[in-house]
Amino acid sequence: MYQSQSILDRTKADKNQPDLNQYRWPKDDLHFIPDWVYTSDAIYEREVERIFHGKTWNFVALEAEIPNSGDYKRSFVGPTPVIVVRTEDGSVSVLENRCAHRGAELCRNTTGNNKEFVCPYHQWSYDLKGNLQGIPFKRGLNKAGGMPKDFRNEDHGLKKLSVTTRNGVVFASFWQDMESIEEYLSPEILKDFDVVFSGKRLRIHGYYKNEVPANWKMYFENLKDPYHATLLHSFLVVFGLMVAGNESAMIADSRYGIHGTMASAKKEDKYAQINEDTKKEMRSFHDGMSLLDDRFLEFVREFDSPWSVTMQTIWPNLIVQREMNTLGVRQIVPNGPNSFVMMWTIFGYEDDTDEMTSHRLRQGNLMGPSGFLGLEDNEAIKFVQEGVRKSKSDTNVVKLDSGNTGTSGSLISEAAIRAMYKHYREVMGL
């Protein structure tokens, strides 16, 4: 059970514009991050307004999850519940999961198939495109009560979000005049995005969900921080998945600096070959570690890509993982400044052999809330949140590779984090 029953039950404390005049970014704006971006309720409310409800494409589903007419998935844009549904004409609608009558959340199931959506409170009903189609006792009873004569159903449907898809991935936005997803992501990010999502039909293998008691932005920072990868993760280093000597890169989109790809090429050896000087820098390296089942480390070269590992951050709520042959997406759902939910979807391809499916599932133990890698990230992020909440210090230092902002060819870099916060400050007005 999550600490807060439903991690997503948090409501906005104040719908008015929060007063942010008290907040001042450090003078060296690129190389320091103030603690209050992780802990302030006022900052969080503006993030919801300007980022999640602003001019961004938010991941909401994979088309493979809703293949048939009426199939739906309950999802989120920021903290806001939405319904992703396949309509009768084959298109995808994304609707705010809030009855137009009294605001009740009308869809509570995670997935299902419906011909319509009916609010449990007063039974108002909507079609799959969110149009209001039925109101009990609309004209009253015995010539008394009911809606006024000028009430128009077409004026009271569910809020419809802008929708786009790219090779089976569904994005939605509260912004009604969004640029194309291709423009939004940029060629640098699309290159590796399209390696995983090439248009091949996906096969969903399963889901994880976990709550992390930390600020949602920390998870984005973590995957724009290749510096930590070879220091925190013993598994990555010992078994050669990402080592300081491997060919690697941290790639940021050149337009906004908010999307990124952390990439590395695994060497052929199952176990890392690391010189003694490098070992001294990495306390996470432990000589003699091995696996009882070496099949876990096998890498099947299935893509036309130089990388064996790519971790993509797509602002503001999506991570696309390709860790050797385990594939998945992670959706970030914020729940105030000090908590977020991570929703994981693990998949393969419809044309995978049974052997390949078994291999993906076996290797899938790398990821997830208690995976060989996922567990350590969650704990480290929690430690940072505890530190910024309790300490009297007020800034974080991001000076590694200080000459770059955005893309870097070094793993010992925080350039992508700096690029993210440069854009963040512009959007947030900080």
PLM regions with names:
Residues E65-Q176, E183-P187:
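Rieske [2Fe-2S] iron-sulfur-binding domain
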Residues V48-W57, K129, K138-P148, S391-D394, ...:
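Short, charged helix-to-loop "capping" segments that act as catalytic/coupling loops
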Residues Q3, R86, S91, N97, ...:
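C-terminal catalytic domain of Rieske-type non-heme iron oxygenases
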Residues F59, E65-I66, F137, F235-M242:
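Short, charge- and proline-biased low-complexity linear segments
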Residues M1-N109, K159-T165:
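N-terminal pre-ligand scaffold of iron-sulfur
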Residues G54-I66, N142-M147, M311-P316:
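Short Pro/Gly-enriched beta-strand edge/turn motifs at strand-loop
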Residues A13-I43, T111-S125, G157-N167, T261-L297:
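N-terminal short leaders/motifs
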